[in-house]
Design a protein with these regions (language model features):
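Acidic, metal-coordinating helix/loop segments flanking the phosphotransfer/catalytic sites
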Residues: 6, 31-49
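His-Asp phosphorelay/catalytic-motif detector in bacterial-type signaling
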Residues: 2, 46-48, 72-78
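Two-component/phosphorelay signaling modules centered on CheY-like receiver
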Residues: 3, 11-30
Length: 99
């Protein structure tokens, strides 16, 4: 069975790009555009990997807050954080939260 990867990003083009690349490599992918849809997807079926954008415009929670909550519920769920606008402080926070 292929690994199930959940991709969370507010930009549809980025979600589709990452999903397409991973699907071409044989992975099963799902996408979410904000915190609410991400939590719904995770609770409906826990993914094998979470690819999570740090800045989610229009979302109730940003990627770091989603990471913190997800790791409190699913400690062993691997998470890869992505961002087009990262900085050292944000990267350190993501590592501290378990990414």
């Amino acid at each position: 069975m292929a690994l199930d990867i959940l991709i969370v990003d507010d930009e549809e083009d980025i979600r589709e790009l990452i999903s397409g690349i991973l699907s071409d490599e044989g992975y099963q992918t799902r996408t979410a555009s904000d915190s609410d849809s991400a939590f719904r997807e995770i609770e409906a079926r826990r993914p094998s990997l979470l690819v999570l954008d740090i800045w989610l415009q229009g979302s109730k929670k940003d990627g770091l807050e989603i990471l913190r909550i997800v790791k409190s519920r699913h400690k062993d769920l691997p998470v890869i954080m992505i961002s087009g606008h990262g900085n050292i402080e944000t990267a350190v926070a993501a590592i501290k939260y378990g990414a």
